[in-house]
Amino acid sequence: MSFRGAGLRARNVSAAVLIVFLVISTAALPGCLRRGSEGKDQVVDKFESEPTISLYINETGEKRQIKMEEYIAGVVAAEMLPDWPRNAYAAQAILARTFTLAKMSEGGMRNEYGTDMSTSKDETQAYDPDSITDVIREAVTATRGMILAHAGRYVKGWFHASSGGETTLARDGLAYEGAEPAYTKRAAVPAELRHIPDDELYWSASYSLAEVRSLISAQGFSLGAVNRVSIIQKDPTGRATKVRIEHAGGHTDISGAAFRSALGADRVRSALITGLNSTSAGIEMTGRGFGHGVGMSQWGAYGMAQEGSSPEEIVTYFFRDVDVQKLWD
């Protein structure tokens, strides 16, 4: 399973790390994307005009037609904090638009609701039209029709709240099971560290051993009474990629991403665990960052925008060999 990553605002609503992909209407559109059946990266085609998408309102059961750019504004408002610089919002808009268009061939929520997407953050993408500001509208307008592509195909526009200073690859941050995408990379993010508040950057969490057993067992792992927890493998950025749980029945090794998800992604904010003390009483952890660490760091985008980077410079910084393309005027 591949995850997008809880945004700065959306993460406060859901503790889960979500897979976040959207689709636009399957009605025939001039210049629409080629539609496949396997959900793989799609070839980029231009549109003659801005698409309209269908949206299922989970709260009311209503189905609504909405222009793409209006929808993107609601997504950006839901995924980022208020009062941020315009170019940070604009970078987020490019990724949100890329996600939406990349899923045109995958059916969206048509099997469930007969629509392209829903307002459920667990099913698609965070959406909050009531929080759209003038600055967000300006950012969406400034990037109208823009998406991020690699070799003529849409990228998986992963993002996360904070990288802790360096982003990582999908196989490490997400335990991504497919081939590593050619456009992911590890990138130092000094602009993030220059601007992020300490309470956003650093975190700590503690659990009793009984809690560890209960939470990890709930994910389908068979554990005896837990005796010790340790990190046995890290990636080059320092993120835990394999965690060992020693218990009465032996030991169980799980990925760092699975460990974080099991214990709660709102408490274990990232796999960039800088300290883990395991005793008979429980475990205490410290770490940096928030989210899986793959793709664009939102606090990195904030810092880069504050220091004068354009939206295009921001999004291309976090991915390898990509370019921004404009698909409609």
Regions picked out by a protein language model, each given a short descriptive name:
Residues 1-329:
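Conserved, single-site charged/polar hotspot
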